[in-house]
A protein has these predicted regions:
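Active-site-adjacent structural elements that line small-molecule/cofactor binding pockets in enzymes
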Residues: 1-145
Length: 145
């Protein structure tokens, strides 16, 4: 597409690699086709698991039509807020809560329909609680995946 020059603009921290993947986010067939034509990955917004086969097929078809057949791409899942364990009552609701086994089961179900990347956001009231949630994911959920 068109490019626009900017003066005295920077991005920090600088990317670790010059080969940056293009992730497309959105909902609907137009976003799926755009991913096939230009993207390296897709994050569906509000898609359900039963939509993933159609999403993946549409991306592959658009990639073929754009001469990008055989190019790999990632499909993500963004399930929303998570809390490992029983969330405190004063915490805003989270979509994915419960013991590590339940969270791993949900993420495995996403993988079974084609998602190979996920974006989880953890609910927490303090930075310490947030860091505890990250540690719990790494130590208790990740080994189950």
């Amino acid at each position: 597409g068109e490019a626009y020059p900017y003066v005295d603009v920077g991005v920090s921290p600088a990317p670790a690699s010059r080969d940056l993947p293009i992730w497309v986010g959105g909902s609907g067939a137009a976003a799926w086709r755009r991913t096939g034509r230009r993207g390296d990955g897709y994050i569906p917004m509000g898609a359900t698991r039963d939509q993933y086969p159609e999403i993946i097929a549409t991306i592959r078809r658009a990639a073929e039509e754009a001469g990008r057949g055989g190019v790999g791409f990632d499909i993500g899942i963004m399930p929303g807020w998570a809390y490992i364990g029983e969330p405190p009552e004063d915490l805003p609701p989270a979509w994915l809560t419960g013991p590590p086994e339940k969270i791993a089961e949900e993420l495995r179900a996403d993988r079974a329909v084609g998602a190979n990347a996920f974006h989880l956001k953890f609910r927490a009231r303090t930075i310490e609680e947030y860091l505890d949630q990250l540690a719990a994911f790494g130590e208790q959920v990740r080994p189950l995946l």
